[in-house]
């Protein structure tokens, strides 16, 4: 027999017996009765954002700000999911995927600075995998570093080619 006081441990992906939007309604009702601001913990509000997102992906809804109790008595679960999904979708469209400069990194591999010009290729691939994991800031940082290193090694390769051609044609035979 389960103890009603202690919560049962569950898998992170499974749904709880109490739906999170219903839990939020209960918390806002308590807030209205006591006339005190009830701060939701970060883990609870994060779980609410994840569940209302409808995708179970770790996207934060930044444009929502602080949660306000709804004016209607009991909004349906589907409507709260739809509204949150619209906010998340519009936020995701505002931030475009950063460039990884993979073509530039591959082009730098043809320059004569051979072991060093693999470094921008590695950073470019790391940037692409960061985008797939959802880390846009890290992907942007790695993409910029890949671009900087690619351009640097292309310029260094051109300098090496110019020096080699100059030395080859100016040395008397």
From Swiss-Prot:
Expression sites by tissue:
Present in adipose tissue and undetectable in other tissues (at protein level).
Q: Which residues lie on this side of the membrane: Extracellular?
A: 172-173
Transmembrane portions of the chain: 151-171
Which conditions up-regulate this protein?
Down-regulated upon cold exposure in brown adipose tissue in Zucker lean rats. Down-regulated by dexamethasone.
Which GO terms are recorded in the biological process aspect for this UniProt protein? cellular response to insulin stimulus; endosome to plasma membrane protein transport; establishment of localization in cell; glucose import in response to insulin stimulus; protein localization to plasma membrane; vesicle fusion to plasma membrane
**Region listing for Disordered, in residue ranges:** 1-22
How does the record say this protein sits in the membrane?
Single-pass membrane protein
InterPro entries the UniProt entry points to: CD225/Dispanin (IPR051423), CD225/Dispanin_fam (IPR007593)
Q: Where in the sequence does UniProt note compositional bias of the Polar residues kind?
A: 1-17
Please verify whether the record's keywords include Glycosyltransferase.
no
Q: Which residues lie on this side of the membrane: Cytoplasmic?
A: 1-102, 124-150
Q: Which residues carry this modification: Phosphoserine?
A: 16, 43, 45, 70, 84-85
* Signal peptide start-end: none
Q: Which GO terms describe its cellular component?
A: cytoplasmic vesicle membrane; endomembrane system; membrane; perinuclear region of cytoplasm; plasma membrane
**Which coarse location class applies to the principal site listed for this UniProt protein?**
membrane
UniProt family annotation: Belongs to the CD225/Dispanin family.
Q: How does it assemble?
A: Interacts with SLC2A4; the interaction is required for proper SLC2A4 reacycling after insulin stimulation.
* PANTHER family membership: NG5, TRAFFICKING REGULATOR OF GLUT4 1
Spell out the protein name for this chain: Trafficking regulator of GLUT4 1
The protein's organism comes out as Rattus norvegicus
Q: Gene of origin?
A: Trarg1
């Amino acid at each position: 027999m389960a103890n009603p006081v202690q919560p049962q441990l569950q898998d992170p992906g499974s749904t709880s017996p109490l739906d999170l939007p219903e839990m939020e309604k209960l918390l806002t009702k308590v807030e209205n009765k006591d006339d005190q601001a009830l701060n939701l913990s970060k883990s609870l509000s994060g779980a609410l954002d994840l569940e209302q997102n409808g995708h179970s992906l770790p996207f934060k809804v930044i444009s929502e700000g602080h949660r306000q109790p709804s004016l209607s008595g009991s909004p349906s679960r589907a409507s709260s999911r739809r509204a949150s999904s619209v906010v998340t979708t519009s936020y995701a469209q505002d931030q475009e995927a950063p460039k990884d400069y993979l073509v530039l990194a591959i082009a730098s591999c043809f320059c004569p600075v051979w072991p060093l010009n693999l470094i921008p290729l590695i950073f470019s691939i790391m940037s692409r995998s960061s985008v797939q994991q959802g880390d846009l800031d890290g992907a942007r940082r790695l993409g910029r570093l890949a671009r900087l290193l690619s351009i640097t090694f292309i310029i260094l390769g051109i300098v090496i080619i110019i020096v080699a051609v100059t030395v080859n044609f100016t040395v008397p035979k």
